[in-house]
Amino acid sequence: MTDLTTSAIERVLRNNYLGHLAYLWQGKPHVIPITYYFDPADNTIISYTSEGHKIDAMRKNNSVTVQVEEIQSMFNWESAMVHGTFEELEGDIAKQKLHSFIEGVKSIIRRKERREVEFINEFSSKLYSRGIPIVYQVKILEIAGKRRET
């Protein structure tokens, strides 16, 4: 196993839209899958959610981790990990970031999966599940990555 370079870590983040978000709730770590978009211009991870356990936890403790992997086989994979700070967005900034998220994910799906998606509900059901979406970003403080290949 070897460490990934910064540019390789950013490539893993740029080329994917599904990852895992880790946060603390009542002293215990929780890890859940998320749909995300890596914004290299702002060095942030953008996502959204609705009211509930996850958002309550991140509002109380804003230290989070996002992990993303590309797995070809048990002996051939790359993993990127981002440590950062949760920040809830509102108003025009939230709208702009949600637009960036939607367009960014659509672009990745077009490139990687060779299919067209027109609406957010084609790759994420959260928007229509419970109320108004809560847009947030993870300000990246530290990154790390590993690679295994044979």
Where are the predicted features?
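Short, basic/aromatic recognition patches
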Residues: 1-20
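Short beta-strand segments
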Residues: 16-50, 66-67
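Beta-strand-connecting loop/turn residues
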Residues: 41-43, 62, 141
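Helix-adjacent hinge/juxtasegments
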Residues: 54-89
